[in-house]
Swiss-Prot record:
Cofactor: [4Fe-4S] cluster
Organism encoding this protein: Methanococcus voltae
Full protein name: Polyferredoxin protein VhcB
SUPFAM superfamilies: 4Fe-4S ferredoxins
Domain 4Fe-4S ferredoxin-type residue range list: 23-52, 62-92, 100-129
Co-factor binding details: Binds 4 [4Fe-4S] clusters.
Alphabetized CDD domains for the sequence: MtMvhB_like
Gene expressing this chain: vhcB
Ribosomal protein as UniProt keyword: no
């Protein structure tokens, strides 16, 4: 599954080539070369890329798939599904503009997995060390990594 529906339209903003919610990070599939620095730099594993050689990043697992991109699009489905309110929609300011972001309070998380099961992008993961990974905190490290490749496939909306 990726962020595009069967008509190759973004599930959240309904545009043809970009994805990333209505107020966050936009992905332009026409510019993307699936090279993966964005996934590697993301501190919360909110991006998964399968490169042309079939290497899934950031995990570096070999797969038969190729050229796949998934990211947290800040849709808030996980927040709605969380029975303990460990996940909340928050705000962050970049360049004087306010953006949505997901905030996580580990002490409230009961590891029920409701958020993981309902995530439409299939990027959330429960683990023992951090409890939950895969949600976007809008740190913008992915955009910086993509800019360094001169692809500019990721940008702020």
């Amino acid at each position: 599954m990726n962020n595009l529906n069967s008509e190759n339209m973004c599930n959240c903003c309904n545009s043809a080539n970009s994805c990333g919610g209505t107020n966050g990070i936009s992905w332009d599939r026409e510019k993307c070369e699936y090279c993966g620095p964005c996934a590697i730099k993301c501190p919360n594993d909110a991006i998964m890329v399968v490169n042309p050689k079939g290497l899934e990043l950031p995990s570096r697992a070999k797969t038969e798939r190729a050229n796949e991109f998934k990211m947290c699009d800040l849709c808030g489905t996980c927040v709605s599904a969380c029975p303990t309110e460990a996940l909340q929609m928050g705000k962050i300011v970049h360049n004087e503009k306010e953006y949505d972001r997901i905030e996580f309070t580990p002490s409230l998380c009961d590891s029920c997995g409701a958020c993981v099961e309902i995530c439409p992008q299939n990027v959330l993961k429960l683990n023992e060390e951090y409890k939950l990974k895969g949600f976007c905190v809008m740190c913008l490290k992915c955009i910086d990594a993509c800019d360094k490749t001169n692809q500019n496939a990721l940008s702020l909306k």
